[in-house]
């Protein structure tokens, strides 16, 4: 059962801050700065896609420091008439990890008949500022049995995250304060009632197959394909190059709201 968060993102949904941590200057507490990102949006045009998402949009990072992705709220809306069949699975991915089961941070399944949906994911791990600047997170989307002509957008997704920004990694205990949705590994969240379209396949398996398929076929409509070669088969693309073909799915400039930032 998914944990649904309605309205404004509430930091207390993810972090249990004591009164002293809220009142004391940051130098006297383990928490440097707790922030809520701006909204990033993905317009889904394909039945299966792997798109980059900026979960730290608008977050001021510390040079030479760290950022902990505590949690995020994902909102989705079907751009379809009522009572359509089919559904979707949405999975958050850390693209640095080569093993698919370790790359999947959480997934969610819902039917197209549920016009709007919202769920919470708690990754709760830190990365360096340098890695964060490389935009390491992706979203794997698998739409099944939604009959829409090619070139249209059946689904829109929006992402807002709660994170902790800090300079030094010497004080421990932050992870103990974070609300845990599931301590047994990557989450698989689902609605109580899901259309029969959904196959019993973990999202980590879908990710592994998608990566393999993408690396074999290479990006579409690439004008530089085979450039500098006299002929023959095009040179296979690396995984990093393949990822670029999905950049057009991201609407970086489309923001529906600007989230607040709270520092302690």
Swiss-Prot record:
GO CC terms: host cell cytoplasm; host cell plasmodesma; host cytoskeleton
UniProt keyword RNA-binding, yes or no: yes
Predominant localisation class: host cell
Source organism, top-level taxon: Viruses
GO biological process: transport of virus in host, cell to cell
Segments of this protein annotated with the region Disordered: 211-264
Pfam families in alphabetical order: MP
Disulphide linkage map: none
MF terms (GO), sorted A to Z: RNA binding
Residue ranges, compositional bias (Basic and acidic residues): 237-247
Localization (cell): Host cytoplasm, Host cytoskeleton; Host cell junction, Host plasmodesma
Keywords: Host cell junction, Host cytoplasm, Host cytoskeleton, RNA-binding, Transport, Viral movement protein
Keyword check for Signal: no
Function: Transports viral genome to neighboring plant cells directly through plasmosdesmata, without any budding. The movement protein allows efficient cell to cell propagation, by bypassing the host cell wall barrier. Forms a ribonucleoprotein complex with viral RNA. Binds microtubules and modulates microtubule stability. Can bind double-stranded DNA. Triggers host hypersensitive defense reaction in incompatible plants harboring resistance (R) proteins.
Similarity field: Belongs to the tobamovirus movement protein family.
Subunit structure: Binds to host RBCS at the plasmodesmata; this interaction seems required for viral systemic movement. In resistant plants, interacts with host MBP2C at host microtubules; this interaction prevents virus cell to cell movement. In resistant plants, interacts with host resistance (R) protein (e.g. tomato ToMV resistance protein TM-2(2), AC Q71BG9) at the host plasma membrane; this interaction triggers host defense responses leading to programmed cell death.
Name of this protein: Movement protein
Organism in which the protein naturally occurs: Tomato mosaic virus (strain S-1) (ToMV)
Classification lineage: Viruses, Riboviria, Orthornavirae, Kitrinoviricota, Alsuviricetes
Gene name in the database record: MP
């Amino acid at each position: 059962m998914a944990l649904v968060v309605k309205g404004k993102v509430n930091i207390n949904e993810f972090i249990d801050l004591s009164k002293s941590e809220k009142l004391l200057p940051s130098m006297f507490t383990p928490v440097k700065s707790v922030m809520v990102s701006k909204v990033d949006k993905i317009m889904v045009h394909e039945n299966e896609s792997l798109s980059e998402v900026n979960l730290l949009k608008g977050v001021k990072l510390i040079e030479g420091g760290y950022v902990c992705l505590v949690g995020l709220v994902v909102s989705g809306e079907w751009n379809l008439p009522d009572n359509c069949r089919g559904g979707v699975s949405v999975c958050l991915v850390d693209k640095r990890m080569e093993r698919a089961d370790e790359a999947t941070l959480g997934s969610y399944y819902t039917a197209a008949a549920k016009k709007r949906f919202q769920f919470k994911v708690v990754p709760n791990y830190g990365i360096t500022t340098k890695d964060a600047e490389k935009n390491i997170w992706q979203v794997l989307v698998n739409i099944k049995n939604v009959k829409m002509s090619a070139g249209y957008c059946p689904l829109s997704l929006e992402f807002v995250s709660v994170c902790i920004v800090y300079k030094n990694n010497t004080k421990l205990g932050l992870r103990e304060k974070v609300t845990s949705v599931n301590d047994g590994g990557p989450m698989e969240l689902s609605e109580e009632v899901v259309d029969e379209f959904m196959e019993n396949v973990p999202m980590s398996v879908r990710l592994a197959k998608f990566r393999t398929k993408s690396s074999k076929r290479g990006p579409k409509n690439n004008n530089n394909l085979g450039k500098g070669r006299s002929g023959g088969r095009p040179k296979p693309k690396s995984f990093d190059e393949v990822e670029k073909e999905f950049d057009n799915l991201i609407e970086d400039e489309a923001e529906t709201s600007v989230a607040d930032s709270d520092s302690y």
